[in-house]
């Protein structure tokens, strides 16, 4: 079973080095991290991935890297999170490349995409944007809790609610059937990421 809080990295939003922000979040209970920061060059991203693995390993945490199976293999990352643009064929190709043990996530933006991701062999998916958010422009209006509930009902795939998640709505996402919530700005931009993570973990427990 995957931890119910998926922490999404954003070094531009953090007020300290990203590794320090993640370390603080892990101290607050984060056990599942998605390394995005796709604008880094390959070597810098590889080094960052290794730093995050070192932070997560002592607590049995898991790291997935956004859209880069080669980096996952080189850095020893447990899995890859694919963008929606990769499509269903991308999930199948990645499974063939990485094998059955790899953790594969997928960014979905509709109920139909959740069902398709399950059929293609993904291990989990994010559904976004559930709520209005400045972090996820370009994906249309917020889907809302009813779409989240429909996605969770229609599929056995663990679904993580993403987009506009905060301490006031995280619990509602779980009650709608989500396996968890994916949070970026709520923790990355916090002046106290440890305490903010503690609050999120408590809200969705």
Model segments located where?
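Substrate-recognition "cap/lid" segment bordering the active-site pocket of phosphatases
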Residues: 136-142, 147-149
């Amino acid at each position: 079973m995957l931890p119910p809080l998926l922490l999404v990295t954003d070094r531009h939003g953090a007020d300290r080095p990203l590794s320090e922000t993640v370390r603080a979040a892990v101290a607050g209970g984060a056990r599942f991290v998605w390394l995005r920061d796709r604008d880094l060059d390959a070597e810098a991203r590889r080094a960052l991935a290794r730093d995050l693995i070192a932070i997560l390993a002592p607590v049995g945490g898991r790291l997935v890297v956004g859209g880069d199976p080669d980096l996952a293999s080189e850095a020893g990352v447990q899995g890859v999170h694919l963008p929606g643009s990769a499509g269903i064929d991308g999930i199948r190709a990645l499974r063939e490349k990485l094998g059955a043990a790899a953790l594969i996530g997928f960014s979905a933006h509709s109920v139909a995409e959740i069902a398709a991701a399950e059929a293609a062999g993904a291990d989990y998916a994010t559904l976004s944007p559930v709520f209005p958010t400045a972090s996820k422009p370009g994906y249309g209006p917020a889907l809302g809790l009813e779409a989240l509930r429909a996605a969770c009902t229609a599929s056995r795939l663990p679904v993580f609610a993403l987009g506009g998640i905060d301490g006031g709505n995280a619990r509602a996402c779980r009650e709608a059937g989500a396996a968890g919530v994916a949070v970026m700005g709520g923790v990355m931009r916090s002046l106290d990421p440890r305490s903010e993570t503690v609050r999120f973990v408590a809200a969705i427990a």
